[in-house]
Amino acid sequence: MEKPSSPLRVPVFYDFSSTICYLTHRVLGRLGPELAALGIALDWHPIDLAAITAWRRGEPVGPDRARNLERLAQELGIAVATPAHWMDSRPAMAVAALLDEAPDDEERWREAVWSWVYQDARDLEEPGALEEIARRAALRVAPPSAGALEEIERRTAAAHAAGVRGVPTFLLDAWPVGIGIQEDETMLDFLRRFAARKRGDPGPN
């Protein structure tokens, strides 16, 4: 199949505090070559899930939920260290938002944050976390200002107004779709069908 000349951009809303978002990030990462062949580019948008749901910063992740997340990760073949509590991810997400105009830097930052939390079992709230993450990502970033944190609030409010009620959520033709985490082939089929509809491809009979 010939790769489309113009990429189809798909917004994905996420929160670094969400283990489900981490698993989705890893599944979509494995699908990178297939998505590129389909001409699909993912745009990752950080939002503060605690501002629009019942989750509260500092709230413990109970043992039953932790076991369920770890079982899901095993089914997907992804190693994960589930955080013990819902951490304050706003500063890390504010840095991601500040890097919007430098996509390669934003991608490196996002990957470094995911790895810090879900591979190294580190807390985003521990002293010096952002500085060490930046060092690992080979980036120079300043601590987020009050304005940068307010930008996350603004983006979260805008996403909520657009119908986003959780993460991860894909925005397809202005319609928010929260499909949760799926196996690779299911996720790929979901995005393949959307791309076909968007481009007017009737697909196989």
Write out the residue ranges for each language-model feature.
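C-terminal cap of thioredoxin/glutaredoxin-like
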Residues: 3, 8-14, 20-38, 108, ...
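Structural alpha/beta surface segment adjacent to cysteine/selenocysteine redox centers
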Residues: 16, 20-117, 202
